[in-house]
Amino acid sequence: ACNFQILMTSITVAKFGGSALGVEGAMIPKIIDRIRQLQQESKVIAVFSAPLIEYNNKASSMTDVAIHVGRSYAASTPVEIEVLREIYERIASKYVADSRRRQEFLDSLDKFYRQVIISLKQAAENRRFVDVIRSRTLAYSGEVTMSYLMDYVMQGAGIKSSHVLIEKWPIITDDNFEAANFMVQESRQHSDHLIELAEHSDVVSMGGFIGRTVDGLETTYERGGSDRTAADVAILLNDGYDVKIDLEKDSAVLSADPRIVKDDLEFIQYLSYNEAKLAGMFGMKILDPIAIKEIDDNDLDIPIVITDMARPGAVTMIQRKPPDGGNPIKIVTGKKNCSMVRMESAAASHLVASLEFDRQYHDFIKLSPYRVDDTEMTRLLFLDADYVRRHERHIRAYYPKADIVYGRGVVTLIGDEMWRVPKIASTASSTVSEHDINILNLDAQEETSRILIVVEDKGSSVADAVKAIHSTRKKIRGA
């Protein structure tokens, strides 16, 4: 038999977030340089977030500004809306020198801005800034507009680029407008335009965070959703191309949050999907954990690279099964503002099914059960106490006597290989106790690659516990 291998075209799906773009697009020249570097190895699909803007004396995402404007209109206290347009005019005048290209972009901007005005009028009439009114406003004052603009910037820089037309958007979602769910089959049926652009261009520009329903209504993912867009685009292209995802951030992955821990920080070269998903859930801003979940759910193995934009040589590679080695405790992370919910296990299983399948909500952890008399009880640790506050009635509908406790924080040790280290849980817990931090709960299960320590979220207790455990990480390593 003839043994030959078809060489697939390589594509890098590179995501540039708001901080990568900078205030008023100040970092655009660096992004162009970076895209040129990526181009040397492969074609590029560049996924852009909305830029940052100086607003009310602080740097804010255009998404936050648009939400502020929309809510003001809904509350009948309209504010200046030109801000949603003018930033793009300023960026275009600075970075698109060719007058024909600039005019072409400004024509699109006019069209988008009209959509924003119509949506804001509807928000004022309905006294609500929700659903498609919200997602349409965000799309046309944020990611979609920025992706069109970046195409013209790249063309002006001599790059053979194109942009995905919003009318032919490949990311198809359900109609959960503010926290949409990716629909892979429907998206595949709408991906011809994207594939055609990828075939005929070196770089394709596309907006993150935004989806469309089958019948063409704009939707958004939850905040941080541009990571998901990059993952979803990679899923759509994976059959026909050799795809990798490159998330351009202000740092590669470190062993703890550098804002909390200053000493002995270690650069993490490899993470598994599982480790990265856990780290994202438990407070490390690596990437949106749902992005990995979507790749996982589709049973794919697409490499994800986290690149430090300032030092592109510093990368963390995330794979389904990374090579072994290094400290078995990859990351120590902390999360404030958590909530503990206790209820009978039978009721808890129904609540969990409702959250995961009906509401597509996954931001909680089921801890080890315990018994009261003859009844098995379950503890659910919610990683966002505000969600519990908003949905207390829904939770109590499953178990009226549910015990709901707020003011909890969680410190998590993460590593698929931690089970190899003897006494790791007891060392971690005694370290925390030595710092006079009261441990309310410890949950360590070999199969889960995590050790959770629940503490009171009071003052700097979570940060102190992270520092304490991280300082023993080197000692535990070879214990």
Language-model segments: which ranges?
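A conserved regulatory-domain signal marking ACT and ACT-like small-molecule sensing domains
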Residues: 314-479
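Glycine-rich beta-alpha junction loops
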Residues: 51-52, 251-253, 308-313, 347
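Surface-exposed alpha-helical segments enriched in charged/polar residues
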Residues: 33-37, 195, 293, 430, ...
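Nucleotide/pyrophosphate-binding catalytic subdomain
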Residues: 2-287, 444-447, 453-457, 477
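Surface-exposed amphipathic alpha-helical tracts and adjacent flexible/coil segments at the periphery
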Residues: 287-289, 307-317, 388
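Structural beta-strand/beta-sheet cores of well-ordered domains, especially the beta-sheet scaffolds
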Residues: 12, 202, 243, 269, ...
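Phosphate/diphosphate-binding loops
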Residues: 274-308
